[in-house]
Amino acid sequence: MKRGELELLIYLITSAQGLPGEPRIYGSIRLTEAAYKLCRILQEREPENEKLKALAERLEQDKGKALSQEEDFWNMLQDVSGMLVECM
């Protein structure tokens, strides 16, 4: 297992551990961060994949809006869902 993959696994497990008692939106924030980390791992394997790069950039750009601009955050998730189809 590569370092980035192990770090993602650690992040997922510790995030799941921390969820009880946290606001509901935190789950979506953590999943979005995990998706971004996975995009970065995949980009290391496919650095020429422009669609994957665009997906990672969009996640990075708007993932912080969950608490201050929640509607924009949900719209970003809709957009990146469509971008995922293009990555297939």
Residue map of PLM features:
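Short terminal alpha-helical segments
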Residues: 1-26, 78-88
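Alpha-solenoid helical-repeat scaffolds
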Residues: 2-6, 25, 29, 46, ...
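Amphipathic alpha-helical interaction modules
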Residues: 18-60
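Amphipathic alpha-helical binding modules
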Residues: 59-88
